Amino acid sequence: MKKETIFSEVETANSKQLAVLKANFPQCFDKNGAFIQEKLLEIIRASEVELSKESYSLNWLGKSYARLLANLPPKTLLAEDKTHNQQEENKNSQNLLIKGDNLEVLKHMVNAYAEKVNMIYIDPPYNTGKDGFVYNDDRKFTPEQLSELAGIELDEANRILEFTTKGSSSHSAWLTFIYPRLYIARELLKEDGVIFISIDDNEDKQLGLLCDEVFGQGNFVAKLPTIMNLKGNHDNFGFSDTHEYIYVYAKNKDVCSLGQFDIDESEVEKEWDEDEYGLFKRADTLKRTGQDASRKSRPKGWFPVFINSENKVYVTDDDKPLNEDDYVLYPVSPTGEELSWSWGKKKINDEFYNLIVIDIKDGKNIYKKQRPALGELPTKKPKSIWYKPEYSTSTATTELKNLLGAKLFEGPKPVPLITDLVKIGTKKDSLVLDFFAGSGTTAEAVAYLNEKDSGCRNFICIQKDEVINKTKNAYSLGYRSIFEITKKRIQEVFKKSTTTSDNAAKIGFKVIHTIDDFRAKVESELTLTNHTFFDDAVLTPEQYDALLTTWCVYDGSLLTTPIEDVDLSGYTAHFCNGRLYLIAPNFTSEALKALLQKLDSDEDFAPNKVVFYGCNFESAKQRELNEALKSYANKKSIELDLVVRN
């Protein structure tokens, strides 16, 4: 029987990274756990990896603290909104809207969603001085504690605590804020995943250097200037700003592939023709060009091609036309040089429909037809500067106002812009994450694109429960937090959707929120005067559900995975992804007997792990459960791991 307490590990600024090294390179550590640098260099040199002698890095006050934040466990638990989630339109959905500090939520997600996200889009605070960004941190450290955990001098620890506790909007504060979020976000991306990050000039340079550090310089894909306001922002000195930037980084550029844009109908009509085999346009001549194109270099490519009265191209084995009047063409250049055909005889006869005959001054020429990929519309590669009239910020504001019936949110991102990012960053079954959800543009873009191309993409949007200022119009209309606006927008989007319930996973959405980790409080209150070893932990319904949800995610289950209630002679247990959870008190001998019987008789019930809440199982009951499960030879020969968890 294993005992564990989730989120209780003592982490430092590099503890997780050292754990990775120890797991993969144990020979690089001595018996006392000290790292032997030369050993690792020997391994690298033996693999013929080229070592760079030149390097640079981004340093700022708070970098060690930011690394520590990335490694620290969450201080919260996850709870679901059961009333919302059990509604007909939401109960089978794979979409998620999560309320809470995004760093906390990301820390929870990494247990279940590591390498499961295809695309991330975020629109973080720009730190303009006017967007309200101030770094606030409610983690309580003494200078001595921070110095030890982050591996820094006491003086630096004091200076870091000064800006984290008093609030700061410096570059250092912004970098300290964004670093741990990007670090964990990378862990969530699939190996071929991609992240898009909107930013403006205020933190542009810092963000680029930071992304190089987090994702690797070699995984930089693009920095896209994006025209958001053609009129320009006249408040700036010297020039009227018309654009922002979108940084694009891959998790692994070697395996990442970005999509292309569909060509609209007017472009199709303008650039493409159509025959009975589909769309096409004229491509290269059938005559070979370039080096080694001559008859001498490729003698088998020299033969006559015939064109009949209907401009059908063909060849014959004996190099004689089927009709005397058919046109004869050899691969000769305009200067008279004898060349070769780029297709052989068999391909010419098999794919005559992919050739075009063009009349020219001195006779005829043959060109190949370029066709779009099978079953796909023609596409075009995205340009490195992004502009469409519908990317306008003012248009986005108007459209959101029309959707919600009033102006509730300042500066929403345009749906067409995010739709285009989703289009090139995903496939039809991808998972999209936005952990600065704001007004919910990403959710709407995913829903819109699904409707347009019959996709099954899902979104996870995370939004802090940020209080709305009483002077804002949204407050006067009854909204008390940005999250309420996000939720309302997504609800309205799905109300207007024509998507049917045939694919329930892509309509509706589930709501999850964070709550304070009550366990720490309970443990601190366990004294000899108010607690005995025979007391059970009294949990509210919300605490009970939060503990169950958090445990499931901690053990690797997605937040949308169904949790099945299991009746054990009046005791309710919970079954999820092969794990059985026992949280409630009063687990009786009858419940144990029912569990053993169910293991034998229910062919669909095959847990591989039993997790129970230690606070509700006294020591004697723990031993009884452990001995019974370990000694009982169930008919399915299931080996059960038993974990007591607090």
From Swiss-Prot:
Chemical reaction(s) catalysed: a 2'-deoxyadenosine in DNA + S-adenosyl-L-methionine = an N(6)-methyl-2'-deoxyadenosine in DNA + S-adenosyl-L-homocysteine + H(+)
Pfam family, one: N6_N4_Mtase
Top-level taxon of the source organism: Viruses
GO molecular function, one term: DNA binding
Catalytic activity, EC: 2.1.1.72
Enzyme class: transferase
Region ranges (Binding of S-adenosyl methionine): 123-126
Keyword DNA-binding appears in the UniProt entry: yes
Keywords: DNA-binding, Methyltransferase, S-adenosyl-L-methionine, Transferase
Residue stretches spanning the membrane: none
Assembly and binders: Homodimer. A heterotetramer with stoichiometry Res(2)Mod(2).
Family: Belongs to the N(4)/N(6)-methyltransferase family.
Misc: This R-M system is also called EcoP1 and EcoP1I.
Summary of the function given for this chain in its UniProt record: DNA restriction requires both the Res and Mod subunits.
Protein name according to UniProt: Type III restriction-modification enzyme EcoPI Mod subunit
Organism: Escherichia phage P1
